[in-house]
Amino acid sequence: MTEESLIEYPCDFPIKIMGKSQQGFTQSVLSIVKTYAPDFDDTTLEVRSSRNGAYLSLTCTIQATSRTQLDSLYQALHDHPMVTMLL
């Protein structure tokens, strides 16, 4: 049985990464994202702080080229200790 993708590659694909607001969080996330999406432009990074400033939400819109790329990127982000949640 083959797994059919609902996504047509290449495409712009937003990834939302959340974690506690701490030194090095943004840089760590960007480093991981650039490992799997080397063309990601830092200037397009969207950063939002929670109401009380305890958490950060980063949205990285990458140029996704394959399901394998997305799966690997999500796994690397999920495994990082500073990342609390991914969407």
Curated annotation (Swiss-Prot):
Pfam families: DUF493 (PF04359)
Residues spanning the membrane: none
GO cellular component: cytosol
Record-given protein name: UPF0250 protein NE1487
Family named by the database record: Belongs to the UPF0250 family.
Domain of life, per lineage: Bacteria
Family annotation (HAMAP family): UPF0250
InterPro entries in UniProt: UPF0250_YbeD-like (IPR007454), YbeD-like_sf (IPR027471)
